[in-house]
Curated annotation (Swiss-Prot):
Protein name: Rho guanine nucleotide exchange factor 1
Ranges of Basic and acidic residues composition bias in the record: 281-310
Purpose of the protein: Seems to play a role in the regulation of RhoA GTPase by guanine nucleotide-binding alpha-12 (GNA12) and alpha-13 (GNA13) subunits. Acts as a GTPase-activating protein (GAP) for GNA12 and GNA13, and as guanine nucleotide exchange factor (GEF) for RhoA GTPase. Activated G alpha 13/GNA13 stimulates the RhoGEF activity through interaction with the RGS-like domain. This GEF activity is inhibited by binding to activated GNA12. Mediates angiotensin-2-induced RhoA activation.
Annotated region (Disordered), positions in chain: 247-402, 761-800, 839-865
A Pfam family hit: PH_16
UniProt free text on domains: The RGSL domain, also known as rgRGS domain, is necessary but not sufficient for full GAP activity. The DH domain is involved in interaction with CCPG1.
Modified sites of kind Phosphoserine: S372, S904
DH domain mapped to chain residues: 414-603
Record keywords: Coiled coil, Cytoplasm, GTPase activation, Guanine-nucleotide releasing factor, Membrane, Phosphoprotein
UniProt GO cellular component terms: cytoplasm; membrane
Residue numbers bearing the Phosphothreonine modification: T693
Amino acid sequence: MGEVAGGAAPGPPRSGLVSIIIGAEDEDFENELEANPEDQNSQFQSLEQVKRRPAHLMALLQHVALQFEPGPLLCCLHADMLSSLGPKEAKKAFLDFYHSFLEKTAVLRVPVPPSVAFELDRTRPDLISEDVQRRFIQEVVQSQQAAVTRQLEDFRSKRLMGMTPWEQELSLLEPWIGKDRGNYEARERHVAERLLSHLEEMQHTISTDEEKSAAVVTAISLYMRHLGVRTKSGDKKSGRNFFRKKVMGNRRSDEPPKTKKGLSSILDPARWNRGEPSAPDCRHLKVEVDEKPGPADRKGSLGISSRDRTVGTPGQDNPGVSLHPLSVDSLDSREPGVDTPQEPGDTPPQGPTSLEPLAPPESTEDNGETESPEPGDDGEPGRSGLEQEPEEPPGWRELVPSDTLLGLPKNQVKRQEVISELLVTEAAHVRMLRVLHDLFYQPMAEGGFFPLEELQNIFPSLDELIEVHSLFLDRLMKRRQESGYLIEEIGDVLLARFDGAEGSWFQKISSRFCSRQSFALEQLKAKQRKEPRFCAFVQEAESRPRCRRLQLKDMIPTEMQRLTKYPLLLQSIGQNTEEPAERAKVELAAECCREILHHVNQAVRDMEDLLRLKDYQRRLDLTHLRQSNDPMLSEFKNLDITKKKLVHEGPLTWRLTKDKAVEVHVLLLDDLLLLLQRQDEGCCSSHTSRTLTPTPDGKTMLRPVLRLTSAMTREVATDHKAFYVIFTWDQEAQIYELVAQTSSERKSWCALITETAGSLKVPAPASRPKPRPSPSSTREPLLSSSENGTGGTEAAPADARTERILNDLLPFCRPGPEGQLAATALQKVLSLKQILLSTEEDSGAGPPRDGDGVPGGGAPGPTHTQEVEENLLSLEVVIKQLEELEEEFCRLRPFLSQLGEILSPNLAAPERSAQTGLS
């Protein structure tokens, strides 16, 4: 059946094969099937055979892209491309390979072996050594072999049935196999170019995910260029997340078939915030070329320049095609065009001398302008040089004289590499902040998507951060230039940034920006759900080349990520610094960075807590509290927990009776303990809360909102997960039995409740308690106006103020005779004194002396011990009630003062009339 398909399959006949109609009576039928030259001479027996034949590989890639998951095959091809690079280029290329195939968020992610995934999760990819990188790539490729083999088998079987693409084009190439190698390779590249162009036109049919389709075409285009195939629009897309095209043309034009020289500059260090010294050289070459206007007119014949010129400006990107505009690739998309007109000839390109004059026509003034903004942010003069000048850690070696480099000790070499990494990553961070500002913040403001005040809350202090980081980068660049690329002293530059007033200002603006991350992401996510126009704007902006295939949600946390890197980099610099004074400066700067990071982390936690409290406040149902007649709950009828500080939260079990328990979610605030019922039992983090007011067995009602000023905790002896929380009001005390999930959680809850309650105690009777910092004054204004609620209002009328103050005074009303608490406490003290005196009398006259042989030695018996413990516990409860009363008195004084100011005019008139009557 395979022979029938091979000889009589529909479609164009394959030249080089004799079409023979074989009848069923032919006795040699089986033998001819076994000797089928189609199987013996197939170019698709293995990936090693097909990956060096561009046209055949294009047919295979199109089949796989439309029928299978193309990630494994593309991963193997790109790994083969990396194997041809030198050590330095391979280390830089591994970053792009990681972000394209290994990263968890990669569009073309492939299954990664567990051992490799574990190492990648715990180590930054740019810090992995070259040997480990090669080992990782080998293991990843080996894990993809099974999938690639299945895809090849499927392609071969479908080809025998005439169901694979481009059979007619491939059949035209087969007569040339083994004849004229140069002519055959030129024809193969020419056919592959046509097939690639067709694949780019049908890009939308590869996948329903537009981003994935573009990534597949980008990866294919890159490997085709590696094989010497001229690419057009694919070059502009390929800068999205793969390899560098900028310098590649100048080098690959020397010898297109030789992959090592061509790929030495394929990877774009600026894509992943890395630089290399060759980048300024390429820029310098382009500037020299741009000064020659003569050959610029020639590129019109290539049919490429007009498209490349239009993609350099940000405002002209086509929102419908996410990957097409990429000004960085304009140079490369033209440079292969110089190679390939010579490739169809019988002889391959001769070398750099024959092609050097052809390189300048491809770099014109227009394209020079479109290419330079990409690495250095569009439309910003001077940024391109700043973006390209920093080198990746291995790159600084090329700027230092070889004799000087050989004489450096190992720790000095390590120090210079870390300093170079600090400079490079700082330049990349500045670029990312400018992308946030230019592509998102400004267009959002101009497009009216958010009010200006709310937009400033989403991107707070962005301009200040750009200014601060740019200044720091300029100082580093200046120091590197002054020192001849071998920086000896950097401590003063670091201290000028992270210490003193500059450090305080940096801490303030970075805290403001980082603390809004959660809020900003929620606001942007909600806006995208509600407004399709905004969603389209974000997607179009994210498709810009400057975004490096990162989404907006990935760019917002960049400042926080940068702050975490500073202490590590500075610590490494200090460890490799020998001079004591310089080392002390660097270590001091590292300590300042750690303090800044600690402050920012705390600000982030506080803001996240505030956002959670706002969510709880929105879900909180206070209806039952408002309907309650309990005077202790009256102050909580309009409870606003967003004014509080969240100390701890978590699920607990509230044991109401021996046989009844309720699952609650407990919020420990700075002065309150809230017991909230979860309605959605399946999810603790997104539930709707409702306050509980159970009254089991007709006893005194247990309140779900409790003040911590009179709180105590005790562990339950019979249950290692349970604990008591004891609250006292007037002459009553209520005990809440709560059960944690583990014993460690119980200890944590007890410690936090005790610590929080202890911080509320008044230190002295005459001293006024220090007011707690209000979150509304420190955190609330940072949110949008819609989240903040109503702003400040004018002073209320006297009647309203009076009623408000009376409502505030209501919680201080206490039933029962005055002085009862003090009398009870005094009685408890006298009882304890009497017990202790009676114990001493029973044990003999006078206090016991050391070495007395009297049995008991003055120690009380079991009955006396139990009685003393009971009296001490009851005395402790009364003392806590007295402390609470003392604190309430201190809080009562300002209310009485305000009430006196309101009532004094009304009381003054009757007093004056009475005095007049007496006179």
